Swiss-Prot record:
Ca(2+) 2 binds at D150, D152, D154, E156, E161. There is a cross-link at K22 (Glycyl lysine isopeptide (Lys-Gly) (interchain with G-Cter in SUMO2)). It comes from Mus musculus (Mouse). GO terms for molecular function: calcium ion binding; G-protein beta/gamma-subunit complex binding; heterotrimeric G-protein binding; microtubule binding. The gene is Cetn2. This is Centrin-2.
Length: 172
């Protein structure tokens, strides 16, 4: 029952996201990605060295972890050429940019819950949102939701805990 609430609180924005299955970038974003790619395609061959993926991503404001880079490389460089073309790079960066947007959306939702600006969602915050949404949940059900998301045991849900639980419920 408690998980139904989580699903309904974010359902409308989750449904909007599902309607466009492939993330779209603005022309400016595509141009920015092209410029970063061209910077590393110094010899003009239309490919960049796969080892430069991390540096190229950093140039676009991302801080990829080593494991994340390894996974991307294994998906892109299936033939083991050590090279990546612009199309592959654009695909990777489109995915990364849409993930960034998702995180921003989740944090906006967090701020709606955290109306007293404590940096945490309290039982009181959750109860208010449930009431505003017309959800008839018992105090026990609301407390179960807090308990499920609360990792540090302080009885409230901070931004990281909220991000984790929202990603876990696959609404984003």
């Amino acid at each position: 029952m408690a998980s139904n609430f989580k699903k309904t609180t974010m359902a409308s924005s989750a449904q909007r996201k599902r309607m466009s299955p492939k993330p779209e970038l603005t022309e400016d974003q595509k141009q920015e990605i092209r410029e970063a790619f061209d910077l590393f395609d110094a010899d003009g061959t239309g490919t960049i060295d796969i080892k430069e993926l991390k540096v190229a991503m950093r140039a676009l404001g991302f801080e990829p972890k080593k494991e994340e880079i390894k996974k991307m490389i294994s998906e892109i460089d299936k033939e083991g050429t050590g090279k990546m073309n612009f199309s592959d790079f654009l695909t990777v960066m489109t995915q990364k940019m849409s993930e960034k947007d998702t995180k921003e959306e989740i944090l906006k939702a967090f701020k709606l819950f955290d109306d007293d600006e404590t940096g945490k969602i309290s039982f009181k915050n959750l109860k208010r949102v449930a009431k505003e949404l017309g959800e008839n949940l018992t105090d026990e059900e609301l407390q179960e939701m807090i308990d499920e998301a609360d990792r540090d045991g302080d009885g409230e849900v901070n931004e990281q805990e909220f991000l984790r639980i929202m990603k876990k419920t696959s609404l984003y």
